[in-house]
Amino acid sequence: MKTQIEIAREGTISSQMMAVAAEEHVSPDYVRQMVAEGKIVIPGNHSRKPRAVGIGKGLRTKVNASIGTSSDIIDYGAEVRKALAAQEAGADTLMELSVGGDLDRVRREVIAAVDLPVGNVPLYQAFCEAARKYGDPNKLDPEMLFDLIEKQCEDGMAFMAVHCGINLYTIERLKRQGYRYGGLVSKGGVSMVAWMMANRRENPLYEQFDRVTSILRKYDTVLSLGNGLRAGAIHDSSDRAQIQELLINCELAELGREMGCQMLVEGPGHVPLDEVEGNIQLQKRMSGGAPYYMLGPISTDVAPGFDHITAAIGAAQSSRYGADLICYITPAEHLALPNEEDVRQGVKAAKIAAYIGDMNKYPERGRERDKEMSKARRDLDWKKQFELALFPEDAKAIRASRTPEDEATCTMCGDFCASRGAGKLFAADLRGDKI
């Protein structure tokens, strides 16, 4: 069976492209053309047809939610509930990143529970199984890794983060660079670096990239090029090791497209605001416009407990400058495994950030809703305000918890409501839509 990019290059508009066009209010041929050029991807799988979600140029910024067990907390039911919570809160995609317990079981239960495109990181299970089998993750046999990639694709993975961009030269550059404030923060990245150093061998995912691509192409699983050397501190942002890996990933993105595979490129997780635009411009230029998947990014390192906010600030900037998919960050980041409420708060913060970014990325089509909300507030039209709200149930709950004496107003101002006062003074003028 053919991949979406191969279908698009033949001039055919698939049912998935049609669905994306309808959802995004763009023409089907636009979607087809961008898919053909590798500037839009539609995560999916021949063995499982998830909801059609387009990621890339000219489309709204999408939000990914990541869940998964840890070695300390293994609760399969909780992960399914978190997956459902993410879907209900508005996540566009989901990543199942378990490293504890029966990894086949949790992956399959999560995939069965949601209709979102689900992705994962195959290195996690590979190193977990090597540790269980041999007592040492560095004894991982590359054949086991490729077998796992195939098995996970068979299970229905719609996209897969694969750490292909770490090679021996990248590690040498990291060593020459020396000190890093945040060290290495990618579980998959540090595990692969450790394996390469222990075995004095090249990264098999880089060395046999054509094999990786061949497996994912077989299932039309999107290949998301992971960033194992991403900065884990804003003072490490855009350092030589990170940029070296990005350069390799951008080269691999071009190669993967030539092989008929849909390609994503992953971006960093900690970026000061003044570096966001340049980082995205660099990726877009070097990758030929491949969709960019930013992890956050967190914009300051000193707000644990509130990193859903620090990441939302960075994500809004990223969306504004061209990021196509952003990974949510929860309040539990750097502190604990997220629970259901953390997942909800993370998704909502990221959705708001994506919306704000899109308002500025697409001003001609992104601000009408805000104008209508302003008019509804001016007119004290509460029904309309809730209809326009990104999260109406949250807004309704807050208002209901503090009921005003006059239902036309709220308890913030009560008798001193500015909107009501201005309406009485300038009723005709303030309600003229031309103002």
Swiss-Prot record:
Q: Which residues cross the membrane?
A: none
Molecular function terms in GO for this entry? 4 iron, 4 sulfur cluster binding; lyase activity; metal ion binding
Root EC class: lyase
- The UniProt annotation places Zn(2+) binding at H270, H334
Cofactors required: [4Fe-4S] cluster
- Quote the record's cofactor note: Binds 1 [4Fe-4S] cluster per subunit. The cluster is coordinated with 3 cysteines and an exchangeable S-adenosyl-L-methionine.
Pfam families in alphabetical order: ThiC_Rad_SAM
Lyase in keyword set: yes
> Which keywords annotate this record?
4Fe-4S, Cobalamin biosynthesis, Iron, Iron-sulfur, Lyase, Metal-binding, S-adenosyl-L-methionine, Zinc
Keyword Iron-sulfur among UniProt keywords? yes
Q: Which domain of life is it from?
A: Bacteria
Enzyme Commission number:
4.1.99.23
Q: Which InterPro entries match?
A: ThiC/Bza_core_dom (IPR038521), ThiC/BzaA/B (IPR002817)
GO terms in the biological process aspect are: cobalamin biosynthetic process; thiamine biosynthetic process
Q: Which residues bind [4Fe-4S] cluster?
A: C410, C413, C417
Please give the GO cellular component terms listed in this UniProt entry: cytosol
| Binding site residues for substrate | M95, Y124, H163, S186, K187, G188, N227, G228, L229, R230, E266, Y293
Q: Which reaction does it catalyse?
A: 5-amino-1-(5-phospho-beta-D-ribosyl)imidazole + AH2 + S-adenosyl-L-methionine = 5-hydroxybenzimidazole + 5'-deoxyadenosine + formate + L-methionine + A + NH4(+) + phosphate + 2 H(+)
* Role played: Catalyzes the conversion of aminoimidazole ribotide (AIR) to 5-hydroxybenzimidazole (5-HBI) in a radical S-adenosyl-L-methionine (SAM)-dependent reaction. Is thus involved in the anaerobic biosynthesis of the benzimidazole lower axial ligand of the cobamide produced by G.metallireducens.
Q: Which family does it belong to?
A: Belongs to the ThiC family. 5-hydroxybenzimidazole synthase subfamily.
Write down the NCBIfam families for this protein, in alphabetical order: PRK13352.1, thiC
Recorded protein name is: 5-hydroxybenzimidazole synthase
Q: Which organism is it from?
A: Geobacter metallireducens (strain ATCC 53774 / DSM 7210 / GS-15)
Q: What is the lineage of its organism?
A: Bacteria, Pseudomonadati, Thermodesulfobacteriota, Desulfuromonadia, Geobacterales
